[in-house]
C-alpha cells in the first residue's frame, strides 16, 4: 500500500511540463500519467532484477486502478483491498484540495467537481 501510495502519480512528472502554465508534454498527452507510471515502475523493477513478481503485479494493479473505475480513467477497476485503499485515499485528497480553491473563509461556494456548495 505504501509503495502504491507513493508511486501512483509519479508519471505526472513526465506527463506535465514544468514550463509556464504547466502544459502537458507530448508523451503525457499520448500516454497519460498512469501508463507512464507503469512504464517507470516496470523499468525500475527490471533494473533491480530480483523483485517478487507477485508483489510487482500487486503494485502495478494499485497504480493501474487508482482512479477506481474504468469510466473514471483507470485501465482496470480496483480488485484488491490495497487498490481500494490507495484509490479512496487519493479521492479524499482530491476532495480536500477543493476546499483550498478559494481561500475566503466563512463563505459558501459552489464546486463544479463535487457538484455541491462547500462552506469554506
Region roles according to the model:
Residues 1, 87, 104-105, 109-120:
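N-terminal intrinsically disordered, cationic/polar leader segments
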Residues 1-102:
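Divalent metal-dependent catalytic cores for phosphoryl transfer on phosphate-bearing substrates
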Amino acid at each position: 500500500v505504501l509503495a502504491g501510495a507513493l508511486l501512483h502519480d509519479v508519471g505526472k512528472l513526465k506527463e506535465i511540463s514544468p514550463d509556464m502554465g504547466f502544459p502537458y508534454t507530448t508523451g503525457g498527452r499520448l500516454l497519460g500519467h498512469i501508463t507512464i507510471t507503469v512504464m517507470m515502475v516496470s523499468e525500475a523493477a527490471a533494473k533491480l532484477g530480483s523483485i517478487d513478481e507477485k508483489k510487482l503485479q500487486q503494485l502495478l494493479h494499485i497504480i493501474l486502478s487508482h482512479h477506481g473505475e474504468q469510466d473514471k480513467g483507470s485501465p482496470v477497476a480496483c480488485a484488491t483491498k490495497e487498490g481500494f485503499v490507495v484509490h479512496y485515499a487519493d479521492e479524499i485528497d482530491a476532495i480536500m484540495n477543493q476546499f483550498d480553491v478559494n481561500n475566503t473563509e466563512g463563505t459558501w461556494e459552489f464546486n463544479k467537481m463535487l457538484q455541491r456548495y462547500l462552506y469554506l
